[in-house]
Regions:
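Bacterial lipoprotein signal-peptidase II cleavage site
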Residues: 5, 18-35, 40
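Short helices/loops that flank or line small-molecule/ion binding pockets
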Residues: 97-98, 106-107, 111-124, 138-140, ...
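Periplasmic-binding protein-like
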Residues: 147-154, 221-222, 229-267, 288-295
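Ligand-binding cleft/hinge of the Venus flytrap
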Residues: 77-81, 92-101, 180-200, 228-233
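Extracytoplasmic small-molecule ligand-binding "clamshell" domains
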Residues: 30-128
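Ligand-binding clefts/hinges and TM-proximal coupling segments of bilobed small-molecule sensing domains
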Residues: 46-54, 180-199, 235-240, 267-295
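A ligand-binding cleft/hinge motif common to bilobed small-molecule-binding domains
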Residues: 112, 129-137, 184-187, 210-211, ...
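Flexible hinge/capping segments at coil-to-helix
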Residues: 154-172
Length: 295
């Protein structure tokens, strides 16, 4: 009887130790998992937070500089061979060559550009980006390289109907959502009262006017000049002469506080200006009249 009682007590003790051991193991595993999550969260937080001068090391370590773009002729577009080309495409590659990193390009939705930038999906917004006071609150800019303006595009058939801003009262207006074109419409005493049609890209603004969905299209002079007129898909469209909205400048947008990358990019731009490379690119893509370093 005593032997049975002792055996039972020993068995209970062994089971107790086993249960404690299991509980301890599970607890330790849970703690390890939680620690991993916190570490990962901290790591992600570090990756997505731009500290002063901190981004350049991140870019240098990965060896690539990702430019966020939309298709915007003559800045970034696909040629007849399906190759990405354009003024800013070549400009980006030239700057990256100076910096010793590989240029890469990521198409983005323009109205989500700040989200993409801060999430580090891209390292810069390099696509006809207009410098504004509002944008300066959310990103840092390189030196300006193009002086641009917003213009109004109409059908050639309506050239006698829309001759100045006052004559455009009541006409539906298309512009790329979140663009300088939309801002120009909102700032206009006349156009701000008209029906607004938002497009996902500037090239779609031309489609809206061509199809008759919108009577007016407000977009960058640079793109309008390159995309409409004889020999293009938009030979039936024209720029309204004398109506210029919101003079502006293009620059490269980078993460707020990223001073080291800005300094390096500006240094590379200065070299490209000094050796004539940037001016040659401007002339190649029909941008000599808006090239900032001559105008």
């Amino acid at each position: 009887m005593k032997i049975k009682r002792i055996a039972a007590m020993l068995l209970a003790g062994i089971m107790s130790v086993g249960l404690c051991s299991c509980a301890s193991t599970n607890s330790s595993s849970d703690s390890f998992s939680a620690a991993d999550v916190k570490t990962a969260e901290a790591s992600n937080s570090d990756d997505n937070t731009s500290t002063e001068g901190g981004d350049w090391q991140y870019i240098a370590d990965k060896g690539t500089f990702v430019a966020g773009i939309t298709l915007f002729e003559p800045m970034n577009y696909y040629d007849e061979n399906g190759e990405l080309t354009g003024f800013e495409t070549e400009f980006t590659k030239a700057v990256c060559e100076k910096l010793g990193v590989e240029a890469k390009f990521q198409e983005i939705e323009w109205d989500k550009k700040e989200i993409e930038l801060n999430a580090k999906t891209i390292d810069a917004i390099w696509n006809g980006l207009t410098v504004t006071e509002e944008r300066k609150e959310n990103m840092a800019f390189s030196e300006s390289y193009v002086r641009n303006k917003q213009v109004v595009v109409i059908k050639v058939d309506n050239k006698d109907k829309y001759t100045d801003e006052a004559s455009m009262a009541g006409a539906s207006c298309a512009a790329e959502s979140g663009s300088a074109g939309q801002s120009a419409i909102e700032a206009s005493e006349v156009l701000s009262k008209n029906e607004f049609i938002g497009s996902s890209a500037q090239k779609d603004v031309l489609l809206e006017v061509k199809s008759g969905t919108a009577e007016l299209g407000v977009l960058d002079y640079v793109m309008a000049k390159a995309s409409i007129g004889e020999g293009t898909d938009y030979s039936d469209l024209m720029i309204v002469e004398g109506v210029e909205l919101a003079p502006e400048e293009y620059a490269i947008g980078m993460r707020k506080g990223d001073t080291e990358t800005i300094e390096k990019v500006n240094g590379a731009i200065d070299e490209l200006v000094a050796d004539g490379t940037l001016k040659a690119l401007a002339e190649k893509y029909g941008l000599a009249d808006v090239y900032a370093f001559d105008n």
